[in-house]
């Protein structure tokens, strides 16, 4: 066999393997948006399109409410509404008997609308521990949430959360710290960040109202002994002064009553007995 014939056979065999049929058309299906985050009961517009010039059939598969807004041969535009849970939308087209599809992932979220910070106790001695608690009610998805605890501009602690049930949850973070002298002049705060960028959404921030501690210096044992001694002495002096005032008052009363008694008896004596 000549080299020309061998090359021709090789090319023909390659064409049969790689290109099995000239009538089988390759086409693509696209969906916009590919992913999106919406609030509960929200809606979104979805566009399904294909590169097939004359698709036989096409559409959007979903269990949610949908309305076909507009369409042409190569695309269809839908409104999907009443989205209450995470779901997958599927665009599909059939071209020359072959079906292709592409999915759009939809996530439901609730941003942090309330961030509650609590300091316990609020009156703390220097060197003693206290607890910082931050609570965010009704937020989802939890695995996209991060809570930051601040002392002034300093980040004391931050915490992320694992994937939870697909429903609004309450997120809580607790951190124990030790009070120092400057804490009485610093604001404590909490920041909630819900990052939905990976889900086709935005980033939501919500700060708590700032809180402050009341700081005092603890009293040493020697100072306590002095204070107790001084208080005891002052209390003794007070009691003694009260008793002396009472005794002195009784003495004056008796003296006055004794003088008045002699004069009254003198007046009652008959004239004959008076000198």
UniProtKB/Swiss-Prot annotation:
Ranges per topology, Cytoplasmic: 249-275
One example of a Gene Ontology biological process annotation: cell-cell adhesion
Domain Ig-like C2-type: 41-98, 127-197
Signal peptide, first to last residue: 1-24
Transmembrane domains' residue ranges: 224-248
Main subcellular location of this protein, as a coarse class: membrane
CDD domains, A to Z: IgC2_2_ICAM-1_like, IgI_N_ICAM-2
Membrane topology note: Single-pass type I membrane protein
A Pfam entry, by short name: ICAM_N
The protein's role, per its UniProt record: ICAM proteins are ligands for the leukocyte adhesion protein LFA-1 (integrin alpha-L/beta-2). ICAM2 may play a role in lymphocyte recirculation by blocking LFA-1-dependent cell adhesion. It mediates adhesive interactions important for antigen-specific immune response, NK-cell mediated clearance, lymphocyte recirculation, and other cellular interactions important for immune response and surveillance.
Protein name: Intercellular adhesion molecule 2
